[in-house]
């Protein structure tokens, strides 16, 4: 009689699943305000609500907009027919996106921004005529984002 040894396979400990990279990826399923807010840590949620209140006081209309499968749903703020900014969840972080034309860029006190705002300017994309800045809204980024919005609102 021949004995065959069978090695037991070692099972790897189960890894926690990473958070989905796109918060709300399905075009047919827009989130509610409560679902969007539920994904934010408490301090970031407070900054987010302060920013939303500021935009509403400026007369901005707020709605959800689908930015595509790589970004998903996010907030779009408009005043009249002009887009002021977008606020999206990107890789689990709250990010504000604002486009500044040359006149608005001239209104920004770039030296007064924190390192977060300066980094956003360094990583900005677009053209000199229309610069797109992505600013993380956790921490001091929310203050920088508000300063950028004030510059955009001041010129038009």
Each model region followed by its residue ranges:
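Charge-dense, helix-prone N-terminal extensions
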Residues: 2-156
